[in-house]
Amino acid sequence: MSKAKFERTKPHVNIGTIGHVDHGKTTLTAAITQTMAARGLAEFKAFDQIDNAPEERERGITIATAHVEYQTDTRHYAHVDCPGHADYVKNMITGAAQMDGAILVVSAADGPMPQTREHILLARQVGVPAMVVFLNKADMVDDEELMELVELEVRELLSSYDFPGDDIPIVAGSALKALECGCGKDDCDACKPIIELMNQVDGYIPEPERDIDKPFLMPVEDVFSISGRGTVATGRVERGIVCVQDEIEIVGMKETTKTVVTGVEMFRKLLDQGQAGDNIGVLLRGVKREDIERGQVLAKPGSITPHTKFKAEAYILTKEEGGRHTPFFNGYRPQFYFRTTDVTGICELAEGTEMVMPGDNASMTVNLITPIAMDKELRFAIREGGRTVGAGVVSDIIE
């Protein structure tokens, strides 16, 4: 069978398998690649190939993640699967593998377990927009009522974390049986649930908005003045497009100001516009060199606002990862590194949390001493004197 070439014509979506340990996430991932390979839409990846995921470093944090890719008739997917629970926590908090949607795997034989709950909570906090459920090991449950009970329990759990539990598609099957068969045919009892699952993923998980279609934002990395021309701010465009003559805002650190883009340049060439992913210099009208600094952002007016107080989910590095050796307590004052700059902040731990140990993930409220342009889902590092001791994500903005 000739290998299908990667067609850029289909929309690309990033998904991942989440759920409790041993409920079958990796087996399901292997079964999806095998079923799609039988249909000429993927390359089969065996369980062992996925399970022995290489370790990657993201912001100084070691995360083991397996990446597989496959297509359906309508989409191209990049799928992440993590071997260990801690890897999921780190992955979701750092955004190392951005998920546009998730497949929540729940063993029909066991029902929802502690990590099922924790992964749903994390998905909610880090802004995974949608999920589809696979009730795995359905072959081990011969009682129809028991299956319905587990499904009900999963729906209630999802609803309790503000996911639309009543509407989320749930597909029951056996990933192992599908993997053992591997024919990938619609009428096969073993493979049908995998095909049905992917149809639901295709239909239910929304296509992500591309970075280029979002409102313009560029974190300022450097500023210099060009005599006779004015002030230039340089950085990598995070999202959107900026054109010459656009009105933009300078947000964060101090009062928000408005200005007009009088030039865009890249590799010393003048352009009409810069777009997401480009490293550019932006020439700003009437802005003095001292009016703008690293840590601020240039943005489409009204699209982002500066804040000092927010709720966050954070993962605190272990000693082995180069983090702290000791726990921290309420009132901890590290630096929070947002995009290009460090800002001191004070941590208020969630009620009932006495302290946070290295290796924990924790919910906290942070009060920064200087305002930073932020949205929900913005990622940050927690640092002490330039050394990364944690990673986090803004889950809610307070003020």
Swiss-Prot record:
Chief place where the protein resides: cytoplasm
Signal peptide feature range: none
UniProt: Mg(2+) binding residues: T26
Annotated tr-type G domain residues: 10-209
Catalytic activity: GTP + H2O = GDP + phosphate + H(+)
Known partners and oligomeric status: Monomer.
Entry protein name: Elongation factor Tu 2
Phylogenetic lineage: Bacteria, Pseudomonadati, Thermodesulfobacteriota, Desulfuromonadia, Desulfuromonadales
